[in-house]
Amino acid sequence: MPDIFVAPFLIFVLMTYQDTIDYLFTRLPMFSRMGAAAYKKDLNNTWALCEFLGNPQSKFKSIHIAGTNGKGSVSHILTAIFHKAGYKTGLYTSPHLFDFRERIKISGDSGGLMEIPEQFVIDFTERIKPEIEKTEPSFFEITVAMAFEYFANEKVDIAIIETGLGGRLDSTNVITPELSVITNISADH
């Protein structure tokens, strides 16, 4: 349950991490749009979020990974290689297995990957809520923008960005990568 603080003329509702995640999950297309309204014809929502944030996707170098199988493996291998070579490396993958924060990580000094902090997720979501309500982006579009903002704030040397569903309308396509990697492509599901 959110904490509520009342001050003269102001009411502040502070979201918890779980409140924030619950709010983000309401943006999943299955909850927010049905039928023809769920069809995504362009990248306008992702562009709008990135513009609202000052275009964080243009503040770091990236490698874009796409394909039917092996994206996660290739992404993690490249992250390990860049980290071992001394680069501060961001990693964006999907979906997560247990915790939303698994999607957005940065290579740490200890050699492991550090997940995006809960407080960043909360603060980011609160900050862009007006834009979310205005443009009605999907969960994935918000998550992509969050990853880009986190990587820009943390000044990563390079970010490894895995596509979601892939294709020309994948939200990750707003980046201009240094390199694109295509794993095998085949019929899926």
Region annotations inferred by a language model:
Residues 12-67, 74-76, 80, 84:
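Short functional linear segments
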Residues 30-31, 186-188:
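A short, flexible beta-alpha/helix-coil linker loop
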Residues 36-43, 48-60, 84-175, 187:
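ATP-dependent carboxylate-amine ligase catalytic core
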Residues 67-70, 162:
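Conserved phosphate-binding and hydrolysis motifs of nucleotide-dependent enzymes
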Residues 176-184:
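Inter-motif core of Ras-like GTPase G domains
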